[in-house]
From Swiss-Prot:
Its EC number is 2.4.2.9. It comes from Leifsonia xyli subsp. xyli (strain CTCB07). The lineage of its organism: Bacteria, Bacillati, Actinomycetota, Actinomycetes, Micrococcales. Uracil binds at residues 195, 200-202. GO terms for molecular function: GTP binding; magnesium ion binding; uracil phosphoribosyltransferase activity. This is Uracil phosphoribosyltransferase. Transmembrane segments: none annotated. Pfam families: UPRTase. It catalyses: UMP + diphosphate = 5-phospho-alpha-D-ribose 1-diphosphate + uracil. Keywords: Allosteric enzyme, Glycosyltransferase, GTP-binding, Magnesium, Nucleotide-binding, Transferase. HAMAP family: Upp_B. Allosterically activated by GTP. Its cofactor is Mg(2+). Catalyzes the conversion of uracil and 5-phospho-alpha-D-ribose 1-diphosphate (PRPP) to UMP and diphosphate.
């Protein structure tokens, strides 16, 4: 498993505003979209392309286009939905699937309650959107779900991660082609399974339920 922590002052600035408990939901949503676009730029460095002939106003030349089959973007519901627009604005030709997962707040174990994905992901590059990599359970289960449908490589984009979640995810994805792109790696998890210092519950803050 490869881990890349994006190092950019704009990412750090936007993340600082997201962490602020006084940031209202509309601002939180807008900044999340902007931040994800920056992370997506890093995450798509290895996206597959193929050569194409194009005509400029001056002459013929060769360029590239994103290869078929199209990459698949998979937000983990519900908080991952807040990251979707930032991703597809950068890669609008990508296909979008959905995976609904929830964390049991007592056991911290993930459960799948919904999915809308192609049955066969052979030769597909998949990009999973999950803002908070806390225990690693939900993201690990989502990645396993994709590989069971024959995905060839998976990149997860997370705004924040805890070391415990990364360690659990590395164990769960051993031997698989997985890359994790992070906005920041935080200190630890608290006794409730939340990232510290973190930014709270991303889903609640995105949708104004706190």
């Amino acid at each position: 498993m490869r881990v890349h922590v994006a190092d950019h002052p704009l990412i750090t600035h936007k993340l600082s505003v997201l962490r602020n408990k006084e940031t209202p939901a509309p601002t939180f949503r807008a900044l999340t979209e902007e931040l994800v676009t920056l992370l997506a730029y890093e995450a798509t460095r290895a996206v597959r392309v193929e050569p194409v002939e194009i005509e400029t106003p001056v002459t013929s030349t060769r360029g590239v286009t994103i290869s078929e089959p199209r990459p698949l973007v998979v937000p983990i519901l519900r908080a991952g939905l807040g990251m979707l627009e930032g991703m597809v604005s950068l890669m609008p030709t990508a296909e979008v699937g959905f995976l609904g997962m929830a964390r049991n707040e007592e056991t911290f174990e993930p459960t799948t309650y919904a999915e809308r994905l192609p049955m066969d992901l052979s030769e597909r590059q998949c990009f999973v959107l999950d803002p908070m990599l806390a225990t690693g359970g939900s993201l690990g289960a989502a990645i396993d779900f994709l590989f069971k449908r024959n995905a060839v490589d998976v990149t997860a984009i997370c705004i924040l991660a805890a070391p415990e979640g990364l360690a659990a995810l590395e164990k769960a994805t051993e031997g698989r082609d997985v890359t994790i792109v992070l906005g920041a790696l935080d200190e630890r998890l608290n006794e409730n399974g939340y990232i510290v210092p973190g930014l709270g519950d991303a889903g609640d803050r995105l949708y104004g339920t706190v």
